[in-house]
């Protein structure tokens, strides 16, 4: 269920603000969004997997906090990221 190293490196390269950037809010949100989408697909096939559901809720909460931080810090970067990821905000 975790994303592959290649997919993770691709996401980091796409959303990084500079070379070697792995900790910016944009990168973290993009990685969490990928994990959330994978977990959603898993839960559609495995409705009884409550442990994964709890993990999904934790990831959603973490992403929500990072999005709030980015929105308060730099609204322009927030809007660009929302559009790029296709989130409904």
UniProtKB/Swiss-Prot annotation:
Name the UniProt record assigns to this protein: Small ribosomal subunit protein uS15
CDD domains hit by this protein: Ribosomal_S15p_S13e (cd00353)
Quaternary structure note: Part of the 30S ribosomal subunit. Forms a bridge to the 50S subunit in the 70S ribosome, contacting the 23S rRNA.
Keyword rRNA-binding attached: yes
Gene3D superfamilies referenced in this protein's UniProt entry, alphabetically: 6.10.250.3130, S15/NS1, RNA-binding
Coiled coil: none
The organism's place on the tree of life at top rank: Bacteria
GO annotation terms (biological process): translation
Organism: Lactobacillus johnsonii (strain CNCM I-12250 / La1 / NCC 533)
PROSITE patterns: RIBOSOMAL_S15
Pfam families the UniProt entry points to: Ribosomal_S15
Protein's job: One of the primary rRNA binding proteins, it binds directly to 16S rRNA where it helps nucleate assembly of the platform of the 30S subunit by binding and bridging several RNA helices of the 16S rRNA.
Family: Belongs to the universal ribosomal protein uS15 family.
GO molecular function annotation: rRNA binding; structural constituent of ribosome
Ribosomal protein in keyword set: yes
Record NCBIfam families: S15_bact (TIGR00952)
GO CC list: cytosolic small ribosomal subunit
Record keywords: Ribonucleoprotein, Ribosomal protein, RNA-binding, rRNA-binding
Gene: rpsO
